[in-house]
Amino acid sequence: MKSFKIGDLTVKLPIIQGGMGVGISLSGLASAVANEGGVGVISCAGIGLLYPRFSKDYLTNSMMGLREELRKARAKTRGIVGVNVMVALSNFSDMVRTAISEKADIIFSGAGLPLDLPSYLREDSTTKLVPIVSSARAAR
């Protein structure tokens, strides 16, 4: 199989693991896929439900949970790890900011048109942005 590039990242195998929530696409699966040469993906959907120990606030738990999952994945792989953040999430902005601050390699974003996604990146950000486009109309 041929490798492919996303920006300056080279993906050895043309496999991108889907972001499956709630609690399926976490650090274990993402790091395993990344270790095999694909792109491992952590899903943000419902991640705050898995981390109630941080706070009584779901939004805080979501950000802290994503932070922890990214750090756990990084400890298990040197491969490419991304995050799936649905635009439809009420905490979309917070999750995007968290993924960028934790230096996720890629943010995949669908379930809506993420037109403002590039505005979250700073000049020194290395995170790649990959919109999930569901139709030809949306691509236009």
Report each predicted region and the residues it spans.
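Active-site entrance/lid segments in N-terminal catalytic domains of soluble metabolic enzymes
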Residues: 1-140
